């Protein structure tokens, strides 16, 4: 590892610790030339699949886009940033576990809707309205009915 102070390539690892989450290693290093210490972090670099858009074009997977879509759907809802981060992590784990080199935007949308359905019903309907390109109020009503599931005979929905 190259020293950030003098540029020398000879450094020594003084201490290594695994993060609480277990996904990062923090290393304290000492430069053998200038004797200054610095910290580096090491983590696994996972290769996310490429995204195939509806028009057939391909782009790199972008976590920021997923997070922005979720944040927009959940705007002014009682959902914490940690909850959004957990949803993003679960979706990314699912994509990685699939082992596919490519994933369609439709598949990502389905995963987002499944997570939002469990997390926040209003966020689900907001996301669905954009994702499914709702054009009238009937489509909103259909999405709400679908989300609520089948109605039992004699039972009224609240």
Swiss-Prot record:
UniProt cofactor(s): Zn(2+)
Zinc fingers (unnamed), renumbered ranges: 3-34
User: Would the keyword Transmembrane turn up in this protein's UniProt record?
Assistant: no
User: Keyword Transmembrane on this protein?
Assistant: no
Q: Where is the ATP-cone domain?
A: 49-139
Question: Which InterPro entries does the entry mention?
Answer: ATP-cone_dom, NrdR-like_N, RNR_NrdR-like
Q: Which GO terms describe its molecular function?
A: ATP binding; DNA binding; zinc ion binding
Cofactor notes:
Binds 1 zinc ion.
GO annotation, biological process: negative regulation of DNA-templated transcription
Which keywords accompany this UniProt record?
ATP-binding, DNA-binding, Metal-binding, Nucleotide-binding, Repressor, Transcription, Transcription regulation, Zinc, Zinc-finger
Question: Family assignment?
Answer: Belongs to the NrdR family.
Q: Which NCBIfam families match?
A: transcriptional regulator NrdR
Q: Please give the function described in this protein's UniProt entry.
A: Negatively regulates transcription of bacterial ribonucleotide reductase nrd genes and operons by binding to NrdR-boxes.
What protein name is recorded for this chain? Transcriptional repressor NrdR
Species whose genome carries this gene: Bordetella petrii (strain ATCC BAA-461 / DSM 12804 / CCUG 43448)
């Amino acid at each position: 590892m190259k020293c950030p102070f003098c540029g020398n390539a000879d450094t020594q690892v003084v201490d290594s610790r695994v993060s609480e989450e277990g996904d990062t290693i923090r290393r304290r290093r000492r430069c053998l030339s200038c004797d200054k210490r610095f910290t580096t972090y090491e983590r696994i670099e996972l290769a996310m699949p490429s995204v195939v858009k509806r028009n057939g074009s391909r782009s790199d997977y972008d976590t920021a886009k997923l997070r922005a879509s979720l944040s927009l759907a959940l705007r002014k809802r009682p959902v914490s940033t940690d909850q959004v981060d957990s949803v993003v992590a679960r979706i990314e784990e699912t994509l990685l576990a699939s082992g596919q080199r490519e994933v369609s935007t439709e598949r990502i949308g389905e995963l987002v809707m499944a997570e939002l359905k469990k997390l926040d019903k209003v966020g689900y309907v907001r996301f669905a309205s954009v994702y499914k390109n709702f054009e009238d109020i009937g489509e909103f009503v259909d999405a709400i009915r679908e989300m609520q599931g089948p109605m039992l005979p004699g039972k009224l929905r609240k």
